[in-house]
């Protein structure tokens, strides 16, 4: 089954109420896959993971780049482990793109020349945005502004002569291409916006109180400020605070706003997807619990 939700909606607290002898969790989250970043990514705690098995959580070093191809391979390995145990895999999705790539297949992107890749790697994030806006303005509407990886990939595709915004995962988006999977239920946790934003604001405050700035600094000291893990949402604000360039009030405001904006994009994404149905937490929990 699929359980999709924006950041802060309460996916983890819901799945910890499931029967661990029947279900295991496969997390599709581009941030929670990193080790030693549990505060800023709100990864399931050790206690929460002890209640029900989670896969694809805290498995990569912050120094490792992640993309849909790597995620697919890791997810396939995890899926087979769960199926071999004769349990029901629950796909929890915050990063809709990775889940969709797993279910529908990968984008048919052209092969990228080394010279093109080197050129893009040498560019700053702003330079990438500006050039992408010139070559393929529609692509920017589909990419989270802080997602440097996808900005780079979109630009590479355009520089190879293809419009990234025109690429399709599958022409028939009403059917899942993983015919080996029996998707019995697809849920999108659809919270009232006011409630969701209040939850996000509280979570941002708790992240700061738990030491997100120190967590970011340790990652920066060990792997460098440009490591892939630190491109995760909000860590730029954590580093700015740790460097003394922002106070706690500014840090909280920036972190909360970035998470609200991210959640808004997630909601927009999942409301357009035909494989999930919007429903409240209580209904979703009951529907999942009674799956056979």
Swiss-Prot record:
Family in the record: Belongs to the IPP transferase family.
InterPro entries: Dimethylallyltransferase, IPT, P-loop_NTPase
Binding-site residues, substrate: 7-12
Organism listed in the record: Leptospira borgpetersenii serovar Hardjo-bovis (strain JB197)
UniProt xrefs under Pfam families: IPPT
Domain of life: Bacteria
Molecular function GO labels: ATP binding; tRNA dimethylallyltransferase activity
Site (Interaction with substrate tRNA): residue numbering on this chain: 95
Names of the cofactor(s): Mg(2+)
Region of interest called Interaction with substrate tRNA, as start-end residue ranges on this chain: 29-32
Role according to the record: Catalyzes the transfer of a dimethylallyl group onto the adenine at position 37 in tRNAs that read codons beginning with uridine, leading to the formation of N6-(dimethylallyl)adenosine (i(6)A).
Reaction equation(s) it catalyzes: adenosine(37) in tRNA + dimethylallyl diphosphate = N(6)-dimethylallyladenosine(37) in tRNA + diphosphate
EC supergroup of this enzyme: transferase
Chain sites annotated for binding ATP: 5-12
UniProt keyword Protein transport present: no
Keyword Nucleotide-binding: yes
Entries under Gene3D superfamilies matching the protein: 1.10.20.140, P-loop containing nucleotide triphosphate hydrolases
Protein name (Swiss-Prot/TrEMBL): tRNA dimethylallyltransferase
Coiled coil: none
Record text on subunit structure and interactions: Monomer.
EC number: 2.5.1.75
């Amino acid at each position: 089954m699929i359980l999709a939700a924006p950041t802060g909606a309460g996916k983890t607290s819901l799945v910890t109420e499931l029967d661990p002898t029947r279900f295991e969790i496969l997390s599709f989250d581009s941030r929670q896959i990193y080790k030693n970043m549990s505060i800023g990514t709100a990864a399931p705690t050790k206690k929460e993971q002890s209640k029900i098995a989670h896969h694809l959580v805290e498995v990569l070093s912050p120094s490792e780049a992640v993309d849909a191809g790597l995620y697919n391979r890791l997810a396939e390995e995890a899926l087979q482990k769960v199926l071999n145990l004769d349990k029901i895999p629950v796909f929890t999705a915050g990063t809709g793109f990775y889940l969709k790539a797993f279910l529908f297949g990968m984008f048919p992107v052209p092969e990228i020349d080394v010279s093109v890749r080197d050129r893009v790697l040498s560019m700053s994030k702003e330079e990438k945005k500006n050039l992408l806006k010139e070559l393929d303005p529609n692509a920017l509407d589909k990419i989270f502004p802080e997602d440097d990886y996808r900005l780079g990939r979109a630009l590479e595709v355009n520089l190879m002569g293809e419009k990234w915004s025109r690429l399709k995962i599958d022409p028939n988006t009403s059917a899942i291409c993983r015919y080996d999977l029996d998707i019995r239920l697809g849920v999108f946790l659809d919270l009232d916006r006011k409630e969701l934003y209040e939850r996000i604001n509280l979570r941002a405050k708790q992240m700061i109180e738990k030491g997100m700035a120190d967590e970011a600094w340790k990652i920066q000291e060990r792997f460098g400020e440009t490591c892939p893990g630190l491109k995760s949402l909000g860590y730029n604000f954590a580093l700015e605070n740790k460097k003394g360039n922002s106070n706690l009030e500014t840090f909280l405001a920036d972190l909360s706003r970035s998470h609200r904006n991210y959640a808004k994009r997630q909601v927009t994404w999942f409301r357009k997807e035909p494989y999930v149905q919007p429903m409240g937490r209580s209904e979703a929990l009951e529907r999942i619990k009674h799956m056979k």
